[in-house]
Amino acid sequence: MMREKVVVGLSGGVDSSVAAFLLKQQGYDVIGVTMLMWAPDGTEPQSVTDARKVAEHLDIPYYVLDFTKQFKKEVVDYFVGEYLAGRTPNPCNVCNRRIKWEALIAWAGEQGAQYIATGHYARIDRLANGRYAICNSATAQKDQTYALYNLTQEQLAHTLLPIGDYSKEEIRRIAAEQKLPVANKSDSQDICFIPDGDYGAFLERQVPDKIPGEGNFVLTDGTVIGRHKGVTHYTIGQRKGLGIAMGHPVFVCEIRPETNEVVIGENEDIFSCNLICDEVNYMGMEEGKEQRRCMAKVRYAHKGDVCTLEKQSDGKMKVHFEKPVRAITPGQAVVFYDGEYVLGGGIIQTAEK
């Protein structure tokens, strides 16, 4: 009997390594792959070195696929463009759908593989309406459903998420028991192409001729109160690093790239009850015109708030929260939930009182 073949995306970390082990243990014919996304100096990243060691340890075939050109076009250029437009993007969401899933599923199909798999802390379920949906991992502290909201039904049908039923502690224990070479490797925290976390410096290296220079800090009534370093250095809700002394805490409540202004306000000024999102992906719910009540998260660490969804005539979605939500940020994703299931989500365009 032919074993089902699965291509596992090996990041060089402990989660994807244990995912590969678990799938092999379950009887799958496992192929390990590292997708090379960002290697500006031309040297082999440590992630590739580590993933290769894991594949050798597990005795599975291993390949490195060069997606650097596609990553630059689909993710890095998008990231830069969003910041220049005064928004705060989430490049991981774009990368997940367009590269880690779309491109990897295409390659897997060429190898005769039925599935791809990753080390994300989430699960996939099939709902009563016949649709696939991402649902919360077994341990809420490592839940990664927010980053996967925009996967398509076709992608979900060909995806396995083997560590969604485990806690991080259990994954570490399995890695140690199996003597995986990355068992003690720490988790990565930053955006992979900006490991030092300095977005401003990265943007200046990428598009030095397009970076806006200094501009005015203004109050909500238009009063100029100081100078800022350039709109790409700020995000909605930011309090630290503003370099202005008002005698009390103040926050970034709006970014205006067209006038190179950063609007400063009080804490209450960064709360909103409404947002408009576009690029809506329907996952657990089908596209429909009727209003729907659910929970929504406006950032990865947001626990979620009750809201009503209302599809607009132009295909965008209006999200009305029952109570004001802090720092709704254009460019970030808003993700809709029904209990533990992801209904869908979109990219925040505007926030309104």
Language model features: what each stretch is:
Residues 117-128, 133-353:
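AMP-forming adenylation/ATP pyrophosphatase catalytic core
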